[in-house]
Amino acid sequence: MQLTTRAILIHGCCEEEEFYREGPSSSNKHWLPWLQKQLVTRGIETQTPEMPEPFKPEYTAWKRILDRLGTDEETLLVGHSCGGGCLLRWITEERLAAQNVFLVAPWLDPFRVRGAFLDFQLNPAVSSRVRGIHLLYSRDDKVEGVKESVAQLSSVFPNAKTHCFTDRGHFGIEDLGTERFPELLNLIVGGDR
């Protein structure tokens, strides 16, 4: 079994007002910096890039950053909301490998509110290029499209491991009440992979 040596954590989208508001940027918000620190202290090189204009995301701009980082069979991918959708589009269209893919509150934009950003076809062949796909979602998530995205992902990737919560909303700091996300860390380092 190969050990994870690298991780890429991708934040989700936000509204323009939130982007320009004082406070941490998207890549330094919610549980992302905490998870990055936890992985780094375990010897896993971890990147949390600031994706351009998350309030009006353009796939080609986000892809450029992902291409610079690269991925392989030892790379762990974690995406929150539309960040997970972007990671999935990237590894699908580029036919890339990864060790495990963790999609937290996965959002594939089923109603196309973000234009062509996540306009791609899911491909079951992705399963053959990754060790595991994990879907983490909460029954009380109020973001439109998450439930539909989870259903679509579960249909295309029937072997994906689903981790359903009841009270985590969209997994933001306001939903979790903390910057920590120990359940995700345990899945990554603990073994349910």
Residues covered by each model-derived region:
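Short, surface-exposed "cap/lid" segments of acyl-processing enzymes
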Residues: 2-42, 50
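Active-site nucleophile loop of the alpha/beta-hydrolase fold
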Residues: 12-13, 51-54, 102-111, 138-139
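Short glycine-rich catalytic loops that host catalytic nucleophiles or stabilize transition states
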Residues: 49-51, 163-170
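Gly/Ala-rich beta-loop-alpha elbow adjacent to hydrolase catalytic centers
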Residues: 77-88
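Flexible "cap/lid" loop of the alpha/beta hydrolase fold
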Residues: 106-129
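Short beta-strand/loop motif that positions the catalytic acidic residue
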Residues: 129-130, 134-141
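Conserved alpha/beta-hydrolase "acid-adjacent" motif
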Residues: 142-148
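Catalytic histidine-centered segment of alpha/beta-hydrolase-like enzymes
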Residues: 168-179
